[in-house]
Amino acid sequence: MAAADLLVVILAVIAEQINYIYMFSDFLLTLPVCSLALVLRLATTDWSVWFTVAFTIDRYIAICCQKLRKRYCTERTATMVILIVCAGGCAKSTPFYFAMDRRRCVASNEYLTSSGWRIYELFDSIITPLLPICLILLFNALTIRHIIAANKVRRAVRNSSENGKDPELESRKKSMILLFTLSANFVLLWMPYVIHSLTWQTENYTYADKYFSTPIYILQQFGFMLQLLSSCTNTCIYGLTQRKFREELKNGLKYLFTLNRQVGT
């Protein structure tokens, strides 16, 4: 998931968005490099989204399905899931290679006017991110319901005279907070993109007109911004909730400050 998010930052933010607006690299604007970059950006975005779905399902099985957990939570299963997600993302994104004009790095007239492309864009929007949003909400709701039911049973079994906090209940509470945060973050950041993609086609993607500012275009760019932000926040949220990760981060910051003091003296 982290690797896919990093690829989104490199390909979508640095190689495309920043280049189109500020850098104007001729190499990235040539054909077929431009078309290939578009396919890679869409594929890595699909990977990022569906790895988030896979992580959500993995947490559901690990917490709620103890019998299935032994058979599912294996290295072989993880490898198969990664390969399927990567292959599926590439297959779904490849048709967009032919959406660009054959002479310059802009959308072709056929893409802008064809009903076939409009139907495929609708299909693309359903597969990513409408279906993932539904799956994430569903499995997180089932997981949270299981945790709440298990907490009620544990409280009933515990001796009423027992004092102090229950480490198991605290751990489950943190899991609920993590799942809720990931779900809310993903859904809220993707929602503007979903609204735009289900209603209008993408326009002025390569910023050929720097002064283009219709309300629909502003919604499109706002959706792009939040979509790209979503690709990195989920991994950060999950990482910061892990105790070992926080300890390593603190040690790294302490080392930098110590090194800075040594250099200064």
Language-model features: locations:
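Seventh transmembrane helix
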Residues: I133-F139, I177, S183-L198, I218-T265
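Extracellular TM2-ECL1-early TM3 structural module of rhodopsin-like
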Residues: M1-I57, A62-K70
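Loop architecture of class A 7-transmembrane GPCRs
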Residues: Y22-D46, R71-Y72, R76-T79, G88-L137, ...
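Hydrophobic residues within alpha-helical transmembrane segments
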Residues: A3, L40, I84-A87, I127, ...
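Intracellular effector-coupling site of seven-transmembrane GPCRs
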Residues: A3-A4, V81, R145-Y193
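Hydrophobic alpha-helical transmembrane segments
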Residues: T52, A78-L83, L122-F123, L179
